[in-house]
């Protein structure tokens, strides 16, 4: 919804799709989401009819939880036209297939007109029109140009790249890293310890990008360092906040209630990236440790020990 504000401010006609009739009725009635403080303009169409929303649309922005991208893109394929462009704003890895979202959509829709948009931005900052930057990854010049034309303005900067896999790795794994960074905060460690952890994580992410065929320079992009720094240092990040609750030693009930009432993409991605690393025989000890803390209930204090002993 925050991204919709950019397109709207750039004089684009906006249609929003949801699969929930209740959500549609609530948004139409209140013209506001309970998730972010954004007054939805009255001329933005809100519908549960995907055909209606996709018809005569130039750019289709995919901004839904990663686990629904597969089923949603299969439905989208019924109405997609070859001259349309898909802009992926969702982040994550599908658990069963271990595929990134670009590949999932490519498998379901026969088009190269797909871009991945990613960067260090929070929804409220987008809505408040402060200067922000995005990386836009696509192999299609047409796709990059049409999305940039619709999004760039005097407060939104777009940098182009062809490194789709590197952009998706950064956007996905940063949510997992943010959980661990929040744990350090929850245990009472200062920002100095967090920056040590973030720096070590950047080295590991860069190595993963290279191992999966991406461009290691992507780590220095808006989608890389920019998004990782933001997500790993702010309580506005849901993933960071979850980690902080764990680090503070909150009860299982309190933690589970937070998870139940909040979208935590880092948890979903943690299981996916763990499986991906195993399948590809790639070593990334920091992911194994975060997994052990969250799933196998190891003490969060193992994080600092790991950082000191890490080669």
Report each predicted region and the residues it spans.
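NAD(P)-dependent Rossmann-like dehydrogenase/reductase catalytic/cofactor-binding core
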Residues: 181-182, 210-220, 224-311
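NAD(P)+-binding Rossmann beta1-loop-alpha1 motif at the extreme N-terminus of oxidoreductases
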Residues: 1-39, 43-48, 75
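Active-site-proximal catalytic alpha-helix in oxidoreductases
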Residues: 130-136, 165-210, 221-241
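Catalytic phosphate-donor-binding core of small-molecule kinases
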Residues: 128-133, 138-153, 158, 194, ...
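Rossmann-fold dinucleotide-binding core
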Residues: 93-191
């Amino acid at each position: 919804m925050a991204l919709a504000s950019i397109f709207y401010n750039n004089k684009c006609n906006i249609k929003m799709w949801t699969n929930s009739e209740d959500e549609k009725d609530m948004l139409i009635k209140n013209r506001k989401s309970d998730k972010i403080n954004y007054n939805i303009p009255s001329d933005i169409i809100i519908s549960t009819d995907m055909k209606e929303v996709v018809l005569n649309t130039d750019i289709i922005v995919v901004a839904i939880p990663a686990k629904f991208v597969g089923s949603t893109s299969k439905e989208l394929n019924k109405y997609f036209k070859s001259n349309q462009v898909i802009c992926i704003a969702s982040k994550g890895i599908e658990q069963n297939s271990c595929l990134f979202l670009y590949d999932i959509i490519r498998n379901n829709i026969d088009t190269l007109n797909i871009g991945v948009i990613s960067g260090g931005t929070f929804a409220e900052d987008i809505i408040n029109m402060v200067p922000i930057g995005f990386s836009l990854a696509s192999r299609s010049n047409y796709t990059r140009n049409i999305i940039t034309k619709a999004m760039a303005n005097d407060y939104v900067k777009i940098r182009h790249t062809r490194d789709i896999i590197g952009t998706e790795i950064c956007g996905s794994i940063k949510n997992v890293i943010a959980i661990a960074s929040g744990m350090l905060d929850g245990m009472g460690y200062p920002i100095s310890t967090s920056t040590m952890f973030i720096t070590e994580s950047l080295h590991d992410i860069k190595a993963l990008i290279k191992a999966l065929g991406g461009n290691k320079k992507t780590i220095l992009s808006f989608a890389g360092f920019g998004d990782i720094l933001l997500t790993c240092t702010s309580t506005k990040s849901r993933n960071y906040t979850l980690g902080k609750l764990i680090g503070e030693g909150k009860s299982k009930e309190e933690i589970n209630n937070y998870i139940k009432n909040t979208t935590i993409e880092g948890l979903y991605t943690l299981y996916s990236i763990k499986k991906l690393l195993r399948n590809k025989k790639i070593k990334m000890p920091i992911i194994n440790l975060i997994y052990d803390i969250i799933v196998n209930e190891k003490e969060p204090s193992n994080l600092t020990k790991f950082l000191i002993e890490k080669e």
